């Protein structure tokens, strides 16, 4: 049972981490490159051996786990309604996506064509990001409702930021797929927050220099 929640928590942290980076780009014009790279790398894990393998290891979603802890911990007073709205929208889009096998196949095909470039380039390289952004536009962006990102217009109008946001939304969808594969549902978010918080604490303790507040 604990292993199930372990996997669900990792997947949820993966979604949160990608969306948190989206917020940082929208609000500040940038996000930590290592965190962005870790999220984008998950897109290329098409046949992972485990949930942890999707992110390389637990450290791959360390930021997501810390932010998730803040959202689930009522004592932190750091609940972010905007982040939760993005999370709900991503999960809704993933539900629609699973009913569109042609789009799923298109995504898989495009990712397979991009993947060889990651042998020489970082997942956060502008070239990789541009191609992932195109994949998002050609597939997920055709579904409704489209996710509306809020932030500073000066940041959101910059082409490189637009591409980074789209690539990260694709990464969020990838983690949402994992969440569903692990049996996660929106009801779990509503009624199993305490279980998710417990598992978040457990995972954070395994990460050097990370801790649960």
Curated annotation (Swiss-Prot):
It is a peripheral membrane protein. The keyword Cell membrane applies. SUPFAM superfamilies: YcfC-like. One of its GO terms (cellular component) is cytoplasm. It comes from the Bacteria. InterPro entries: HflD, HflD-like_sf. Keywords: Cell inner membrane, Cell membrane, Cytoplasm, Membrane. It holds the Pfam family DUF489. Belongs to the HflD family. This is High frequency lysogenization protein HflD homolog. It comes from Nitrosococcus oceani (strain ATCC 19707 / BCRC 17464 / JCM 30415 / NCIMB 11848 / C-107). The gene is hflD.
């Amino acid at each position: 049972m604990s292993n199930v929640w372990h996997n669900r928590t990792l997947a949820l942290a993966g979604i949160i981490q990608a969306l948190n980076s989206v917020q940082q780009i929208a609000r500040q014009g940038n996000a930590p490159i290592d965190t962005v790279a870790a999220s984008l790398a998950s897109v290329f894990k098409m046949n992972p051996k485990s949930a942890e393998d999707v992110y390389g290891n637990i450290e791959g979603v360390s930021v997501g786990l810390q932010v998730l802890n803040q959202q689930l911990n009522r004592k932190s007073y750091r609940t972010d309604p905007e982040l939760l709205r993005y999370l709900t929208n991503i999960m809704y889009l993933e539900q629609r996506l699973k009913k569109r096998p042609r789009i799923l196949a298109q995504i898989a095909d495009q990712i397979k064509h991009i993947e060889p470039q990651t042998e020489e380039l970082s997942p956060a390289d502008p070239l990789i990001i541009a191609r992932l952004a195109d994949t998002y536009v050609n597939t997920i962006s055709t579904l409704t409702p489209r996710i509306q990102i809020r932030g500073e217009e000066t940041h959101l109008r910059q082409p490189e930021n637009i591409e980074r946001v789209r690539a990260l939304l694709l990464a969020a969808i990838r983690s949402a797929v994992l969440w569903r594969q692990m049996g996660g549902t929106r009801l779990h978010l509503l009624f199993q927050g305490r279980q998710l918080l417990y598992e978040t604490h457990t995972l954070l303790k395994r990460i050097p220099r990370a801790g649960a507040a």
